[in-house]
Amino acid sequence: MSIASIASTAQGSATILDGKALAKQIEQQLSTRVDAIKAKTGRTPSLATILVGDDPASATYVRMKGNACQRVGMDSIRVEMPSATTTAELMAKIDELNNNPDVHGILLQHPVPAHIDERACFEQIDLAKDVDGVTCLGFGRMAMQQSAYGSCTPQGIMHLLEHHNIELAGLEAVVVGRSAILGKPMAMMLLNANCTVTICHSRTQDLESHIKRADIVVGAVGVPELIKANWIKAGAVVIDAGFHPTDNGGVGDIELQGVENIASAYTPVPGGVGPMTINTLIRQTVDAAEKSAGL
């Protein structure tokens, strides 16, 4: 999909960027790769997830990641630590996993309790096992287009755009949000794909005017339906990385009702970005296992 085709997209004909369907398709490919690793090395790719405390939402996310591992034949090592865990104790556990040759990827579930230095703990993860793309070194290497595992949500979004043959070069992209694991890496990945990128945030003046000129809009700000449908430029590609539970299921950071009559393509909520985030984590763990085995 080129700039010209985006501009000429007929009303009501927006492509649904179905992350759930694509993730299922990729899982079949990953299962084959996992089987090949087992056959050639006698070892099973494994992802270690660390959950500190008893936050219900975090526990749900960790369980979903474990289920995804199981579906492709990987091992899932679940490490649970109490809320009172110190930064030093958590870093020691990460070191233990770094030094375990049977662990190919490490995920520290965000957020950790407030008294823990989360950034220091992220930085403790060995770059070769940073399959969630959370280290500063990994971010820097990605930004400089060197080999590294990308932060999973933006990397999953890029996979989704690539799958739908959306040509990014030359597009005006607006990323709303500047978090270390979503907004900033998303902007850098789009820049590396030759987009002209604007990052908006809580201090941005006149957000609407920025959205109205964007060929690609990425909602990554964590505020329910902050970005209104009538701000969207005709033919734009709309990516909603937010999720906020409601009585009717959930909404994202973008008001999606009516977007199908404006955009050329958009991600549904749920079923768009979320499945691709977990899928990318699993894919990058398989990549790490193959590299570890020299395959």
From Swiss-Prot:
CDD domains: NAD_bind_m-THF_DH_Cyclohyd. Pfam families: THF_DHG_CYH (PF00763), THF_DHG_CYH_C (PF02882). GO terms for cellular component: cytosol. Its EC number is 1.5.1.5, 3.5.4.9. NADP(+) binds at residues 177-179, 202. Homodimer. Belongs to the tetrahydrofolate dehydrogenase/cyclohydrolase family. This is Bifunctional protein FolD.
